[in-house]
């Protein structure tokens, strides 16, 4: 019986490792360099791709900057940490904080096309903005893999700075700002715009149609969709 249990555990671990293993057929070339993902059900998934430089140190309370190039092939297999937020809302425990300021990452799901099929694809793209009152939340809340495989679309989920790190205006910050975007205080909105710019530049490499991009969200994510509708900076980035 013990030997049987050992084999069962090994089988589960091997199965899990295969399902989460990197897949050479998922290699895509972005402006930053190559990324490789993995098979998730009937889809390919890429987790934790940076779409901006980390908004830390001198980039805190600044508009997002374009991401740096990869030094080598990027293994997109792990979700990034959530953006900095109160811990109690997520865990039910009082006090404390969780997440990271280095959080401007996105995740992509596409149908599991073969390399031959990929070259012929140009499918709708949907960018999901999570909810949480612009105080809590993260891009890994839901998996859209079934929607992607059933309807042949590409879904991108994004993270953005929240609370006072995402929306904060102060005279001292305006004095230090060299651009209108830096002085705006609307850093969370600008993060979502930067994600849309990344999609515009790269999603065709995943089989997406840059002229058929939909934005949608839940709760505060819906509010942020409305903000993107109102921003001239985002006017040509979705449809």
Where are these regions (language model features)?
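Positively charged n-region of N-terminal signal peptides that target proteins for export
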Residues: 1-4
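A conserved short beta-strand
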Residues: 235-239
């Amino acid at each position: 019986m013990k030997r049987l249990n050992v084999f069962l555990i090994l089988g589960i671990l091997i199965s899990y490792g295969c399902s989460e293993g990197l897949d050479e057929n998922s290699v895509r070339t972005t402006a930053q360099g190559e990324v490789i993902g993995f098979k998730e059900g009937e889809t390919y998934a890429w987790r934790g791709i940076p779409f901006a430089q980390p908004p830390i140190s001198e980039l805190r309370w600044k508009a997002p900057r374009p991401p740096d190039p990869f030094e080598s092939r990027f293994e997109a297999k792990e979700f990034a940490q959530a953006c900095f937020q109160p811990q109690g809302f997520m865990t039910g425990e009082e006090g404390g904080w969780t997440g990271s300021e280095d959080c401007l990452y996105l995740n992509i799901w596409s149908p599991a096309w073969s390399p031959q099929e990929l070259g012929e694809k140009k499918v709708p793209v949907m960018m999901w903005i999570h909810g949480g009152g612009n105080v809590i939340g993260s891009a890994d809340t839901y998996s859209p893999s079934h929607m992607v495989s059933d309807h042949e679309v590409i879904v991108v989920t994004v993270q953005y700075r929240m609370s006072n790190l995402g929306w904060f205006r102060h005279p001292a910050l305006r004095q230090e700002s060299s651009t209108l975007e830096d002085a705006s205080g609307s850093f969370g909105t600008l993060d979502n715009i930067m994600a849309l710019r990344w999609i515009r530049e790269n999603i065709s490499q995943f089989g997406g149609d840059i002229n058929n991009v939909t934005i949608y969200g839940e709760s505060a994510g819906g509010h942020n969709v409305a903000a993107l509708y109102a921003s001239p900076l985002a006017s040509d980035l979705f449809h």
